[in-house]
UniProtKB/Swiss-Prot annotation:
GO MF assignments: purine-nucleoside phosphorylase activity
NCBIfam families recorded: deoD, PRK05819.1
Protein encoded by which gene: deoD
Keywords annotated in UniProt: Glycosyltransferase, Transferase
InterPro entries according to UniProt: DeoD-type, Nucleoside_phosphorylase_CS, Nucleoside_phosphorylase_d, Nucleoside_phosphorylase_sf
Residues that bind phosphate: 20, 24, 43, 87-90
Protein name, as recorded: Purine nucleoside phosphorylase DeoD-type
Record site: Important for catalytic activity: 217
Length: 234
């Protein structure tokens, strides 16, 4: 048990899917897992373990932003011995290379947060995912007929009042979308010798102002959930 997770030691499988929204975690458990069991609920940040096609998998919410995500990822790795962490979330696209419903694999994560500079003694940390997980995601997407978009994301501490004038520069440096956690997830996994990857479904486009309806968001997210479960239980 930790200050933020009240699961017992052994309740988490080595493979864990992460979502910012704990209700999305509950949705995945109920719709996609067999024998799903709630294992933690501190602060209503839900976690579950269950089976997908007979193989064990865990789910955990992490809240919004790098600070919150880092807390849960640290405790999952250090206390519960989770070895592979896959964040599945939504993002706002900024690149013309991607559109609504596309799934992005974040091969690098820039950020306006100071957390990685603090942990890396004020140097620039290359926040990148695990290669084996990335390869597995890419190969699984190919098998499922999913056109996975690969590029960088920008993990911002700001949901509102973001520096929109910087979008053109980000696109120039092959940043496909804005989200809020990948840079912290990758850095924490690197520090603690775990494997991590972030997949994001495009729910809206910050340049064209297009956005999915609530129904379309669920449908597009389901495709990413299936991809995530398939690759994490191989």
């Amino acid at each position: 048990m930790t200050p933020h997770i009240n699961a017992k030691i052994g309740d988490f499988y080595p493979q864990c899917l992460l979502c910012g929204d704990p209700l999305r975690v509950s949705y995945i458990a109920k719709k996609f897992l067999q024998d799903a069991k709630e294992i933690t609920n501190v602060r209503n940040m839900l976690g579950f373990s269950g089976k997908y096609k007979g193989k064990g998998i865990s789910l955990m919410g992490h809240g919004m932003g790098i600070a919150s995500c880092t807390i849960y990822v640290t405790e999952l790795i250090k206390t519960y011995q989770v070895k592979e962490l896959l964040r599945i979330g939504t993002c706002g696209a900024i690149s013309p290379k991607v559109g609504l419903k596309d799934i992005i694999m974040a091969m690098g994560a820039s950020t306006d947060s100071k957390t990685n500079r603090v942990r890396f003694l004020n140097h620039d940390l290359s926040a990148t995912p695990d290669f084996e997980l990335s390869l597995r995601a890419y190969q699984t997407a190919k098998r499922l007929g999913i056109d996975l978009k690969v590029g960088n994301v920008f993990s911002s501490d700001f949901f509102y009042s973001f520096e929109t004038h910087a979008f053109d520069l980000m696109v120039q440096y092959n940043h496909l979308a804005i989200e809020m956690e990948a840079a912290g997830l990758y850095a924490t996994a690197m520090e603690l010798n775990a494997k991590a990857l972030c997949l994001c479904s495009v729910s809206d486009h910050l340049i064209t102002k297009e956005a999915l309806s609530p129904k379309e968001r669920v449908e597009s997210f389901d495709n990413m959930i299936i991809l995530a479960l398939e690759m994490m239980t191989q």
